[in-house]
A protein has these predicted regions:
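A non-catalytic, helix-rich entry segment at domain boundaries
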Residues: 54-128
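Short acidic (Asp/Glu) and glycine-rich catalytic loops that position anionic groups and cofactors
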Residues: 28-34, 160-164, 203-214
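Nuclease catalytic cores
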Residues: 18-19, 23-63, 103, 128, ...
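Metal-dependent nuclease catalytic regions and adjoining charged, substrate-binding loops involved
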Residues: 8, 12, 173, 186-271
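Non-catalytic protein-protein interaction segments used by genome-maintenance enzymes to assemble
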Residues: 126-190
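Hydrophobic (often cysteine-bearing) scaffold residues that line and stabilize catalytic clefts
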Residues: 43, 47, 102, 142, ...
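Active-site-adjacent bridging/hinge elements
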Residues: 24-30, 150, 156-161, 232
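An acidic intrinsically disordered interaction segment
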Residues: 9-25, 140-154, 221-228
């Protein structure tokens, strides 16, 4: 299996970096080109990382025939959250949230997951598995990591991505998810060519009473080609040094980890 840390040491693109570049080229430049250190760590990033680690543990255990109970997942989350967030002053919490509120929320969400996740007759093929793919016209690899890959009794492959969200996804959000389109293309280039592939978003919804929702979708060859064209277009801009900022007041701005640097750039204090 390829090592994601090693892949990241070399020039590369990923679905998230392409999306980030297209949404705010300036933030991409600050992080990927200039190498500026983030000014803070968003709370949702740390929270999502802890949730992902617990779900990875769940599916690795399931691959061995053991289904972990909700209480185990809650204890595991408490450990993961503590390791990441306890006494971490670099985390910026949204108003009305703190370490303890996220601890409680994460445990509640994972208890809901354990009680609501369907019992599937499937084979777990991969958990947190990195991938790399070559794309014609792209001089660097396109890399990423599958949260989960499963195969059902009829041989259908399902690529699953775990999400935490403040609200349910719309049909358009699911069917137009760029990351999942890239993942399907990568799967075809990494051993699953000619196989029937389904895509699934498993979402833990951060409502007052947490919910667990699964969304299935598929991608056509035309949609795959369109996504890969976006990758090439992003690379073309990056290679030419084009780093357009997002519009002031973009949805990205409140959680951007380069707000001070952006202000300096706007005032002409940074090139």
């Amino acid at each position: 299996m390829v090592d994601l840390a090693e892949l990241r040491k070399e020039p590369h693109l990923s679905a998230s970096s392409v999306s980030g570049y297209l949404e705010c080229g300036l933030a991409y430049r600050f992080g990927k080109i200039d190498g500026l250190a983030p000014e803070f760590t968003p709370d949702v990033l740390v929270f999502g990382s802890a949730i992902h680690e617990v779900l990875a543990e769940y599916y690795r255990s399931l691959a061995q025939g053991v289904r972990l109970a909700g209480e185990h997942l809650k204890e595991s989350f408490a450990k993961q959250w503590s390791e990441r967030a306890a006494d971490n002053d670099f985390i910026r919490y949204k108003e009305g949230t703190d370490y303890r509120s996220y601890l409680s929320q994460g445990q509640e969400m994972l208890a809901v997951f354990a009680s609501q996740v369907p019992v599937e007759e499937c084979t777990v093929l991969a958990v947190e598995e990195p991938f790399s793919m070559d794309l014609e016209g792209l001089p660097v690899p396109l890399i990423g990591i599958y949260d989960l890959v499963i195969e059902d009794s009829s041989g259908v492959i399902t690529i699953v991505d775990h999400k935490t969200s403040a609200k349910s996804y719309s049909t358009a959000q699911v069917d137009q998810n760029f990351q999942m389109t890239v993942y399907q293309s990568a799967a075809k280039g990494n051993g699953f060519a000619g196989r029937e592939i389904l895509l699934r978003l498993d979402c833990l919804i951060k409502t007052k009473t947490p919910r667990f929702e699964q969304y299935y979708t598929t991608r056509s060859q035309e949609e795959e080609q369109g996504a890969l064209k976006r990758v090439l277009a992003a690379w073309d801009g990056i290679s030419k040094g084009v780093y357009l900022p997002a519009n002031t007041g973009s949805w990205r701005c409140p959680g951007c980890v380069y707000q001070d640097a952006c202000g300096q750039w706007m005032r002409g204090e940074l090139p």
